[in-house]
Amino acid sequence: MKTYSAKPSEIEKKWWVIDAKNIVLGRLASRVANMLRGKHKPSFTPHLDCGDNIIIINAAHVKLTGKKANTKDGKIYYRHTGFPGGIKNTTAGKILAGKHPERVIKMAVKRMITRNALGAKQMSNLYVYANSDHPHVGQEPVIYDFASQNPKNKSNYL
């Protein structure tokens, strides 16, 4: 028996929509990263973009467990301006309460995808929106019920 390797013409991409309201961030990000890579398909081929297109809505209502959501001493994100002494930091709580709360999900998924040209192509298949409106109705996305797969996925106790 030979090892199966998919050809680019054989790849079929589906559109999924995931509601992130009250969903734990890390569990959501790891599942979305696997779906973007295509690891949930039996025709997975590591060197091809065989993943699906993912739409995440209600990104502003994603949950962080423990003290990570605190605005003062929660999870810290660092960036550097490129100038001496130019390290800047912000917390996950400030980003979620700020102007672009969808960046928390994008950063979490991006850090779980490989850092190369294929990873950049796979990240272009991720669409994250802060509220429940999205412009991808024409693609007829299928609703992916992430919360019902495991009771730990939905954060009821926070």
Swiss-Prot record:
GO MF, any single term: structural constituent of ribosome
Domain of life assignment: Bacteria
Record note on quaternary structure: Part of the 50S ribosomal subunit.
Entry keywords, A to Z: Ribonucleoprotein, Ribosomal protein
Source species taxonomy: Bacteria, Pseudomonadati, Pseudomonadota, Alphaproteobacteria, Rickettsiales
A single Gene Ontology CC term: cytosolic large ribosomal subunit
HAMAP family according to UniProt: Ribosomal_uL13
Pfam families given in the database record: Ribosomal_L13 (PF00572)
Protein name per the record: Large ribosomal subunit protein uL13
Protein's organism: Rickettsia canadensis (strain McKiel)
Keyword Ribonucleoprotein: yes
Record-level GO BP terms: negative regulation of translation; translation
Nucleus as UniProt keyword: no
Purpose of the protein: This protein is one of the early assembly proteins of the 50S ribosomal subunit, although it is not seen to bind rRNA by itself. It is important during the early stages of 50S assembly.
Protein family according to the UniProt entry: Belongs to the universal ribosomal protein uL13 family.
